[in-house]
Structures are given as structure tokens and as C-alpha cells.
């Protein structure tokens, strides 16, 4: 193990993300992009194994906006999809643009309705809090005539 601040595995719920071989790079990108985010542990292979060698990074523990995550370098077997995404609530247009541009500008791709994917294929929803507040409030209820 190269680095260990503390482990996320003490949390009751940790998001586990599968990467081909770039879990450490992705974790460092997330830690550098979002506040309250950091890499907390990097675990290396103790010896050679099928498809890898001693010292290869196997897992990386990190947080994204305080949410504990672990990235696994599991090879190309599984890919990320829109079935899972991080939804990031933003408080200003500047914050929305900053996160969007960081993700898309680092090899990611744009999608519709505030969705984008990072260069590792993980989906993100960069959502202005004003939008989610308005959706939660709903439209005014129509008045219904009372019945006798």
C-alpha cells in the first residue's frame, strides 16, 4: 500500500466503482474537482497475479463530496452506465459551469438535461439547486369547485 490516511470501509455504505485500470487517476481527478473530496487509501497487489504484477494498484479509497467510495481496477469486464450517476447540486451558474467544464473538458462527453460522462464513463448530473427546488415545489394546484 502506498498511501493510507484512513479507510472508508468503516462506513456502513460505500459506493464501489469498477474501473478498467484507472481507479487511482479517477479518484485523484474527483478529489481535485469537488470540495470535501480526497483520496484516503491506495492498496497495491502484494504479489504477482493473473493479469497483473506485484505493486499494481488494486483498489483506491476516496470520497466525493464527503461520500465514501472505493474504486476497483478490475479490468474491462464491466462498464459504467447511466443506471448509476452522481447527482451534484449546485448553488450558482459559476459552480455548475466549473463542474461541467471540469468533467467534459477532461475527456468527458456532454449529454442532455444536465447529464455528462467523465472520461472513465461514469455519469454525472450537474443540477442547479434552484431547478430541483422548483421541481419539488411543483406547479400551483388548480382550484377545484366544492361540491354541495
What are these regions (language model features)?
Residues 53, 77-78:
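Gly/Ser-enriched beta-turn/beta-hairpin loop segments
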Residues 130-147:
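A short, polar/charged loop-to-alpha-helix boundary motif
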Residues 17-66:
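Core segments of cupin and vicinal oxygen chelate
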